[in-house]
Amino acid sequence: MSEVLRRANNALSSVKQYQSLLNHFAATQSISKTKALHCHVITGGRVSGHILSTLSVTYALCGHITYARKLFEEMPQSSLLSYNIVIRMYVREGLYHDAISVFIRMVSEGVKCVPDGYTYPFVAKAAGELKSMKLGLVVHGRILRSWFGRDKYVQNALLAMYMNFGKVEMARDVFDVMKNRDVISWNTMISGYYRNGYMNDALMMFDWMVNESVDLDHATIVSMLPVCGHLKDLEMGRNVHKLVEEKRLGDKIEVKNALVNMYLKCGRMDEARFVFDRMERRDVITWTCMINGYTEDGDVENALELCRLMQFEGVRPNAVTIASLVSVCGDALKVNDGKCLHGWAVRQQVYSDIIIETSLISMYAKCKRVDLCFRVFSGASKYHTGPWSAIIAGCVQNELVSDALGLFKRMRREDVEPNIATLNSLLPAYAALADLRQAMNIHCYLTKTGFMSSLDAATGLVHVYSKCGTLESAHKIFNGIQEKHKSKDVVLWGALISGYGMHGDGHNALQVFMEMVRSGVTPNEITFTSALNACSHSGLVEEGLTLFRFMLEHYKTLARSNHYTCIVDLLGRAGRLDEAYNLITTIPFEPTSTVWGALLAACVTHENVQLGEMAANKLFELEPENTGNYVLLANIYAALGRWKDMEKVRSMMENVGLRKKPGHSTIEIRSNSVDTR
């Protein structure tokens, strides 16, 4: 370095020589030599406007924002080059407001420094990223008044800007007047249509591009394949894949990743795996795509096998990969595999990521390992909402209502702001508590914090009031939704129907159901279950049968085991056991334990030992460890005085090591909920 400065001291007698050396430092990204020469300029008293301008440009090209900014601001007058380089630097660093400020300063100098075809693309990008339509129109207006309105690089920047604004029609207007479109122009339109949800327009643009014989590049393929995946257009996706092979565009990993993702979105795991297996190089995105594909397909074993293969190949996972695998372990109740993933996350030093912490808490909760939930939570960041929401949801899932409410109070004390996900997890705890005073407290909180504007929160509160038996309050909230949201979704209708049903008000439940159908909301599986249950608990036999026939006639694809269970229960409560059994024999799939359980319960009520024994034997096969089935059959024998048969059933329970689980309840003592067991 000293030799460089010695030569500089001897040889640098002109500004051009300084500029030549600085240009070399910029080209080689040598920030240390630039700083040394900067020091030499200052100590040697050779500071001039031209040298300061070149130094600013050099720092900018080397990515040293602080020095570039300081020198630029100290210059009494900047050159066009320095303006352009500094604007570019700010845009590339994501400092869009700073880029616009420099542009405004540039424009304010008038004819001394006029923006050119290098300036406008970066300014248009800054406006687009800031989503400032007003600024974008000003920039476009200046471009049209300049000589650069027909410059294809400037026009391409305008296309991207308008697509960022979501103004696809304005982008298309610019595209249509372009005389010299290049592949970037077409790619910008395709990707812009995709990002703004105009899938068919993206397809049309791609077809037009191919018909115009434009040479496709990697960006074209990466822009087009997500469109095929979103539309689940497998044929088009395969055609694009064919073009990739014909034009030899598969050399970049981004293209192969896009192909894998497209086939996954189209539901073709086999073709996605075919591409995956033949990839010479795979990055973490590739692995994550395939693992997510298997998890969404419910194929836990293959997802975990890929995880093991990923570890073997030494690929470092990201948070999304591990969180996806942990979630699938939770859904499949594979706690041991979940623990292995937990250890892997620790070894890979990604354990402290909020996504992973949250997914681990949820996984352990689903696997009934609440102790491990709290262990993960104790080490998690308490400043983020995710872990709090997960631990509250885990407590509710495991019937730890008091713990869930306590955690929510602690969350608020520690000034962590709950979000709608937190409250969606919490409201079932208030419903399980069925305490009107507590329900009113959470209602007040939701109103004060503005969460009542959320349809999800309002639906949860309808359920809470329904469980408390305050159906007037539930219906009042239900009616208030109309004013805020203009329409009610099927989940909200279902909550109110369920509320009336659980309190034996079948007439109102059916009335709400029919009102829902008339309003144009399509019932789903859950709303039918709620309405049929309401009929069963209210003794509305004919109404329930009519509703069931309506479902089979108009919504046959929705019919599930739980709907048949409702009708068996309905007929059983009315003493029509033979009809209930005949219905079971007509079920188009294998009857589940809930169906036979409904019949057995009815047989206990009406002391029908023949059908009771038949139902019990089916249940012993389907769920041999359920003590309730043995108890119900024993109760039938006891009611008929068949004590020996009852003792045989009791002996069967003892032989398989079953014990009846004791019940428990929750009582309130001085505003605190206490679980009694």
From Swiss-Prot:
Region described as Type E motif: spans on this chain: 595-670
InterPro entries: E_motif (IPR046848), Pentatricopeptide_rpt (IPR002885), PPR_At4g14850-like_plant (IPR046960), TPR-like_helical_dom_sf (IPR011990)
Domain of life of the native organism: Eukaryota
GO molecular function: RNA binding
PROSITE patterns: PPR (PS51375)
Repeat found in the keyword field: yes
Repeat region (PPR), residues: 48-78, 79-113, 116-146, 151-181, 182-216, 217-251, 252-282, 283-317, 318-352, 353-383, 384-418, 419-453, 454-488, 489-523, 524-554, 560-590
Gene3D superfamilies xrefs: Tetratricopeptide repeat domain (1.25.40.10)
Pfam families: E_motif, PPR, PPR_2
GO biological process: RNA modification
Keyword annotations from UniProtKB, A to Z: Repeat
PANTHER family: PENTATRICOPEPTIDE REPEAT-CONTAINING PROTEIN
Family annotation (NCBIfam families): PPR (TIGR00756)
Family from the record: Belongs to the PPR family. PCMP-E subfamily.
Protein name: Pentatricopeptide repeat-containing protein At5g39350
Organism: Arabidopsis thaliana
